[in-house]
Amino acid sequence: MTAAGCDSRSVSELQRYSWGETSNPTIVLLHGLTDAGTTWPDAVRRWQGGYHLIAVDLRGHGRSPRFEPDQLTRCYQWWLSDTLDLLSTLDSAPVVVGHSLGGLFALRAAAARPELVRGLVLEDPARPPGAPTPDPEFVAMNEAFLDSFADGGQTQRDRMRAESRWAADEIDQWAASKPLVDRAMIHDGLTLGDGTWEPVFNGLTVPTLLVAPTDSPMAPDPALITNPLVQQVRLDGVGHTVRRDDAQAYHAVVDPFLAAVTAGSPAR
């Protein structure tokens, strides 16, 4: 990412990026499947003035390590371990903002080690199917999707500029991340472990904002969420990539939550 003030380095094996003053409250950004830590440019523009932002390339993505062959059946364990390792390196607990796959592991990290997390923003987090092996249809869909970037991503860039409301640099960084995906992970590693879902939300002990499309098939059933710490917002006219699809609506609900959760945040 070329945003001003970006520092890029490897921490605990993962490729890490940061923006903003380290004295500000920290937000950790966890991306979705096939994206990278560089795919947040619009959010960075909006938040870097008031927060210290940290993003990583999740294992198997971007410039972070590939999975070893004997790790592919346990990718979900590595993603959680990597997330906890990252959070444990920070001087104070951050708000963790996660989309899709990143949202799932932000959720699991907060459930496992709540003392490491100040709050959560979960953008249509991935619902784990609980299956012991990858879904062949889901694998084939992702492989075909990544194959469509064989021309360097120009066709997909043009399509998204014509069809979406995404910011131009969001499209560019999204497309640039696809050739960097670990294809062995896509073919053999797409299992997410335990399929428990709504009970994980009900067990959270940190302030949490869930933002999802009104018709999301992955979001928890609102009627089954009884935890008063979990705020749920469902938005019309957006898909799985809520933030990119309607940045104004996303930030209208997320930014006040961040301000409230980080009010009085200790200096780093």
Q: Which residues does each predicted region cover?
A:
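Conserved HGGG/HGGXW glycine-rich cap/lid loop of the alpha/beta-hydrolase fold
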Residues: Q15-E68
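Active-site loop/oxyanion-hole signature of alpha/beta-hydrolase fold enzymes
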Residues: S12, R45, I54-V97, A252
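Structural signature of beta-strand start/N-cap positions in the alpha/beta core
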Residues: T26, H52, A93-V95, L116-G119, ...
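Conserved serine/cysteine hydrolase catalytic core
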Residues: A184-R234
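Gly/Ala-rich beta-loop-alpha elbow adjacent to hydrolase catalytic centers
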Residues: G98, G102, A106
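Conserved alpha/beta-hydrolase catalytic His-Asp/Glu region
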Residues: A131-T133, S148-N202
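Catalytic histidine-centered segment of alpha/beta-hydrolase-like enzymes
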Residues: V238-H251
